[in-house]
Amino acid sequence: TDTGEYIDPLQFYTDRIKDTTAPRATHVILYPQAGKGVVAGSSQKKIVPLNAPGTPVEVWGKIAAGIKAYDYMDGTSNNYGVRSVKLFVDSMNVFSSKVDGFLPDENRMINAWTDYEEYATKSSWFMRSQILPGNTWRMLEANEEGGVVTIDEERPYIFRYELEDLYGNRRSY
């Protein structure tokens, strides 16, 4: 583009490329906020596989989440980034991202949106559902706490992710 923005070229070929495959997730990650939250009795982040649905994780205090997910298309084994991610807690939208382009000088913001430590050490790509302090990337929106959720009652909290691609193929977890 004239501004140097990288854009998703797929939006120009939707009439020529078929896609009926919804994005898929494999794991979520829970981030207790330093000094303010715990996950499974620990102050360390915890990765939870999604192949064990309904398995509760005990958390308390201020918690953020993230998801490991990819988009796929018909007729290929390639994986792609997920265009739209929304996190709902008890049916309230606490975070959303819609990635359809970015400027070269926004790379630092992308690294802050992802769990860069997981990527650098394990080549594992988690998208945070939290806006870290200083991250002003225009593709992210969150609640007043930047996507952080306060768990302060002994009751089930229902976290639900909604993933969607350019074609409107959607899957929830």
Predicted regions and their residues:
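Long, low-complexity serine/threonine/glycine- and acidic-rich segments characteristic of extracellular
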Residues: 33-173
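Short hydrophobic alpha-helix segments
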Residues: 10, 29, 97-98
